[in-house]
Regions:
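Long amphipathic alpha-helical segments with strong coiled-coil/leucine-zipper propensity
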Residues: 36-130
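Conserved NTP-handling cores and scaffolds of large molecular machines
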Residues: 15, 19-22, 100, 124, ...
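Generic alpha-helix signal with a bias toward terminal, lower-confidence helices
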Residues: 16-27, 50, 54, 81, ...
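Context-gated lysine
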Residues: 5, 33-34, 47, 67, ...
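Long amphipathic all-alpha helical oligomerization modules
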Residues: 136-195
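Amphipathic, alpha-helical segments enriched in basic
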Residues: 13-14, 68, 95, 103-106, ...
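Long, C-terminal folded domains that constitute the functional core of proteins
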Residues: 29-37, 41, 60-64, 68, ...
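Leu/Val/Ala/Ile-rich N-terminal alpha-helices, chiefly Sec-type signal peptides and the beginnings
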Residues: 1-62
Length: 195
């Protein structure tokens, strides 16, 4: 966690660099920024292809813009909590592969990364459902011990503080396990793509 910088830290570092940057360095920074902005549009679905966006610029600008694109794409590799997150990761992976189409190892690594995020989603759903069922049964048993008839269709164990507490703990453990694997893949991708 010590290696992760906040957005404010990054902004402050960039501001410090800009104060003493050469014109070439400033142009490089602008191209990086342009690449990141283009990637945001791509990830949001307003731009169909990163290669097409890259083609709109001078060849001399491609390396910096591509680096900005890859930086942004790598930041969008995370453990998805919903379908929208999964789709965003899939789009980010497609973008990484598109920008590195001459490197089959990157495509294979991206496939493994998608497998990890998919397994995370399945494992997360499975744990959630198991905990929910376990809590529902505990509530039902408690009501029966008190002599009350339990209407299982009206029992929502997710509203119980104990459920929320246990789910938070389980989710943190799961995030830790899968997060570590994800970070290893991201580090390898950064290394191979030169970001």
């Amino acid at each position: 966690m010590a290696g992760i910088k906040s957005t404010m830290d990054l902004v402050m570092e960039r501001a410090a660099r800009m104060g003493m940057a050469t014109p070439d360095e400033m142009r490089h920074e602008e191209r990086l920024k342009k690449g990141m902005q283009s990637t945001a549009e791509y990830l949001n679905g307003t731009k169909p292809s990163l290669a097409a966006i890259l083609g709109e610029h001078e060849p001399s600008e491609h390396a910096s813009i591509r680096k900005g694109m890859l930086t942004s794409l790598l930041r969008n590799l995370f453990l998805p909590r919903d379908e929208e997150g999964t789709k965003r990761i899939e789009r980010a992976v497609r973008g990484i592969i598109e920008l590195n189409k001459d490197t089959p190892d990157i495509a294979a690594l991206c496939q493994e990364l998608q497998t990890i995020t998919s397994q995370y989603g399945q494992h997360r759903t499975q744990l959630y459902d198991q905990l929910k069922e376990q809590m529902r049964m505990q509530i039902e048993q408690m009501l029966m011990r008190k002599g009350m008839k339990a209407d299982t269709s009206k029992i929502d164990p997710t509203m119980e503080p104990q459920f929320k507490e246990q789910w938070t703990r389980l989710e943190m453990d799961l995030d830790g396990q899968y997060g570590q694997a994800l970070e290893q893949f991201k580090a390898q991708l950064k290394d191979w793509t030169g970001v």
